[in-house]
Amino acid sequence: MNKKKLGVRLLSLLALGGFVLANPVFADQNFARNEKEAKDSAITFIQKSAAIKAGARSAEDIKLDKVNLGGELSGSNMYVYNISTGGFVIVSGDKRSPEILGYSTSGSFDANGKENIASFMESYVEQIKENKKLDTTYAGTAEIKQPVVKSLLDSKGIHYNQGNPYNLLTPVIEKVKPGEQSFVGQHAATGCVATATAQIMKYHNYPNKGLKDYTYTLSSNNPYFNHPKNLFAAISTRQYNWNNILPTYSGRESNVQKMAISELMADVGISVDMDYGPSSGSAGSSRVQRALKENFGYNQSVHQINRGDFSKQDWEAQIDKELSQNQPVYYQGVGKVGGHAFVIDGADGRNFYHVNWGWGGVSDGFFRLDALNPSALGTGGGAGGFNGYQSAVVGIKP
């Protein structure tokens, strides 16, 4: 056999043996976590988690229901399992990413129609894809210094949503967006930015009186309203009765109590230039910090911080500091399917943060702030462009 043929045969054998790792297919096969492995990971996590009701049960007794998220949110990127006794576990589909991405000790996971949750999950996918460029499994953090802080909003039973009665004073939709069903005659959603902010305000039960009015004009690109559409909130005249602004609503409350929360939501939404519609949005963090101080009289310590300005360790230290001072954090990111705002109000001491999504408690639980492998962050552990342009508003106190 001549040298040329021998070389060809050797290359073929190496390829068949899976040693040509430049081929991403072979690399993914080496690190992929299949469905059985993912389910086993979820069961093991449940058994080791004393906080989850099923924790003391045998593997055979733990019943899991796989959640089909569809598209890139499933399969090779992540698996989500609801626990029959309450709670859920999110497992990454690749061993170059953290094994467990999120969990809850109660309720169930549901991202349908909830854009802030879907967007956050999408950011996980983008980070998992980045990790797939690596040739090393996820090693985790050598030393975890995160404090344990029980959910601050849960401690007061605060679980707001975006529909009735929270949106009874938001603008009424006037037009049909081409290609969509009609929402004409319905009140716009409060928006995740306003809902997150209002939940933090309810936690502090502040202010008793508004400080400064606010007005703005809806963007002419908004397809749900006739233009120009000017919105005004007489915040300076408001007397916020926190006894009537309840921690949560079931629909059986008095009209006074319903109007109290809807007035707060409308004031907050207008103060952050809400882009109203069936799914309302806002630029978020920069406007939230301004509104809290200028319109609602919060402490001048309120300010925005950006993920890209910190290492991973320093960023999480900023969040930990707020939680240790019993101050819920307004948190925001931007992903492929839009922005997402929510409240971080707790920590479990294992690098998971408690998230209140603002959907009446649905899908609330403990989540990692990112799914990145430290090896993907490089020197200094900065954001690396894969943290969804995350920002937070901290120092929120009366």
Curated annotation (Swiss-Prot):
Recorded GO CC terms: cytosol; extracellular region; host cell cytosol; host extracellular space
Record localization: Secreted; Host extracellular space; Host cytoplasm
Region (C-terminal active site loop), start-end ranges: 368-390
Regulation: Synthesized as an inactive zymogen to protect the intracellular components of the bacteria from proteolytic activity during protein production. Once secreted into the extracellular milieu, cleaved into the active protease: maturation can be mediated in cis by autocatalytic cleavage, or in trans by mature SpeB or host proteases. Protease activity is strongly inhibited by zinc and copper, which prevent its maturation into an active protease: inhibition by metal ions may be required to prevent proteolysis of streptococcal proteins.
Gene Ontology MF terms in the entry: cysteine-type endopeptidase activity; toxin activity
Entry annotated with the keyword Protease: yes
Propeptide segment residues: 28-145
Result, substituting Q186N: Reduced cysteine protease activity and ability to undergo autocatalytic cleavage
Active site feature: C192, H340
Expression induction or repression: Expression is regulated by the CovR-CovS two-component regulatory system.
Signal peptide coordinates: 1-27
Site (Cleavage): 53-54, 57-58, 68-69, 79-81, 84-85, 118-119, 129-130, 132-133, 139-140, 145-146, 150-151
Reaction(s) catalysed by this chain's protein: Preferential cleavage with hydrophobic residues at P2, P1 and P1'
Modification Cysteine methyl disulfide occurs at: C192
Annotated residues for binding of a protein: S282, G339
Annotated GO biological process: protein maturation; proteolysis; symbiont-induced defense-related programmed cell death; symbiont-mediated evasion of host immune response; symbiont-mediated suppression of host autophagy
Alphabetized Pfam families for the sequence: Inhibitor_I69 (PF13734), Peptidase_C10 (PF01640)
Family statement: Belongs to the peptidase C10 family.
Stated role: Cysteine protease that acts as a key streptococcal virulence factor by cleaving host proteins involved in immune response. Triggers inflammation by mediating cleavage of host proteins, which can both promote host pathogenesis by triggering sterile inflammation and/or restrict streptococcal infection, depending on host immune statue and infection site. Cleaves host gasdermin-A (GSDMA) in epithelial cells, promoting GSDMA activation and formation of gasdermin pores, triggering pyroptosis.
Free-text note on domains in this protein's UniProt record: The C-terminal active site loop is required for the recognition and recruitment of substrates and release of hydrolyzed products.
Subunit structure: Monomer.
UniProt name for this protein: Streptopain
Species this protein is from: Streptococcus pyogenes serotype M1
Designated gene of the protein: speB
